[in-house]
Amino acid sequence: LSAAAFFNFGTFHFGAYTHVWDTYHYVIGAKYFPELGYTGLYEATIAAEREAGLLPPGAVVPVRDLVTNALGTANADELLARWKPRLGERWSDFVTDVLWFRTRTMPDHFRRTLLDHGYNATPAWAILGSALARVSGPVTDRSVSLLLLLDPLLLLGGWLLLRRAFGWRA
């Protein structure tokens, strides 16, 4: 029963195993944690959208300020000027990775993603997830699928360890 619940009883979000909203936070947030920390994900994402031409010059978009947790707006041009230098050599990779997520959902849905509460993973995931996301290379269907296998594999490993320690009746 717990295994079925983990997989939402076979009813996936928007018909796919990949829940784009959550995966965006935990993959991009971990992969670029050294540059973004816990508070830069949404601002840098808006900057990437502006760089890619998905937002017009002077665009002001709704976003949650991850420092104050307040909803507000941000100027995409100002964010581009701030975040492009901060990511330095990794900027073009960041833009490419953000665009993968941006193209996997409707623009309005992705816009609402930036009103959520940001990347809030544990420090353990910030370390492990960052390493795994970097090793997996650019965000692609394959790399995301492999990263998403981590949870079920860890659960399976836990069950196998329980069985070994206490027998199948436990």
Model regions: which residues?
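Multi-pass membrane glycosyltransferase architecture that uses lipid-linked
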Residues: 1-170
